[in-house]
A protein has these predicted regions:
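An extended, acidic
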Residues: 1-114
Length: 114
């Protein structure tokens, strides 16, 4: 099960459709509850296997720390700019159970280039 969210700006949603299609065809299902922090806590406790999205730091940092401390693998699908702490960089987050991180990253990156 994979959690994600979508931008408030509708014009930004279309570019995310290839990722969503890849997840819907390559994973069990998608969940969206509207809270990045809660989605990350769901990864931390095992209700979700993965979460990906770009959000504001205040939307994800607490859940990121909880997930990381619970043993989740946390990272980004793109390079974090120099001088920006990875824990605060809000773009292209990927947080998963340790066993699925590489496969999920590959799936999402391949969708970006499809």
């Amino acid at each position: 099960l994979v959690g994600t969210g979508f931008p408030y700006q509708k014009e930004q949603r279309k570019k995310l459709l290839p990722r969503l299609e890849a997840v819907l065809t390559g994973c069990q299902d998608v969940r969206r509850n509207g809270s990045a922090a809660l989605d990350l806590c769901d990864v931390a406790c095992g209700r979700l296997d993965a979460y990906y999205e770009s959000v504001s730091p205040w939307d994800f940092v607490a859940g990121w720390v909880i997930a990381r401390e619970a043993g989740a693998r946390v990272g980004h699908l793109s390079e974090v700019p120099d001088g920006v702490p990875a824990d605060l960089y809000p773009e292209q987050l990927l947080v998963t159970t340790p066993k699925v991180y590489d496969a999920m990253a590959s799936l999402l990156k391949a969708a970006d280039h499809a």
